[in-house]
Amino acid sequence: MKHQEQIEAYWSDPARERELVGAIARLVNVKSVKGDPEPGKPFGPGPAAALDEALALCRELGFSTSDYDHYVGLADLNDKETRLHILGHLDVVGEGSGWSTDPYACVEQDGVLYGRGVSDDKGPVVCALLAMKAVRDLGLPLSANARLILGTDEESGSSDIAYYYAREPYAPYAFTPDADFPVIHIEKGHYHPGFGAEWASAPAALPRVAALTGGLRQNVVPPEAEAMVLGIFAPDAELVCRQVSERTG
């Protein structure tokens, strides 16, 4: 039987899917938004708790683990030379508003999982971990080790990975299960500009925008935004809002 056929047969067992869903829920249920640093918890208690839970899961599945001062954790497939790094992360961006379910209590509805981190990146981390388990369980021949690296600061700049690679060498190969399948190339860099201006004093013409705010953080598309506009009547503002909505969808 070819390796692909072996893997497909392995995952055809409904128990595998239940194991996958249960492991994802276990991590999603830990609120791992970055917080103030504490001793032994460089990114606050949330990411540290998620890392503890993930490493416990790895050990329960029979993998050897390491903890780099709660910046990152590791799970190794075997004891051979490491030639593949799988880069995942356990931290999440704040949940924002508009949820119809508890973002930190993973639920399944109509075959879809809902919870903070299901797709970015706790779900993919668990998929990678159980893929490693499948390779091991099936006894597929490998000439090198695959190492799962569990980060805790990806959403705020990846200082966790920088900490790890300041102490350990890069692998010849690496990928991150943090996007769509198949392999894609995204996020070559980030640009976070700040804009400011000064105007000479002038009569305050109306209508004018007095304030504008929106969004949770720099790396998240704002779910909503607000503007304070002075000197405009409500019917006129409603008309403008409808026109913008029709134009932008």
Predicted regions, residues:
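Midchain, well-structured core segments that form catalytic/ion-binding scaffolds
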Residues: 155, 161-249
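Fold-independent oxyanion-binding glycine-rich loops
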Residues: 70-71, 88-90, 110, 118, ...
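Short coil/turn connectors at secondary-structure junctions
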Residues: 80-85, 109-110, 142-146, 169-173, ...
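Short, surface-exposed alpha-helical segments at coil->helix boundaries
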Residues: 48-52, 125, 238
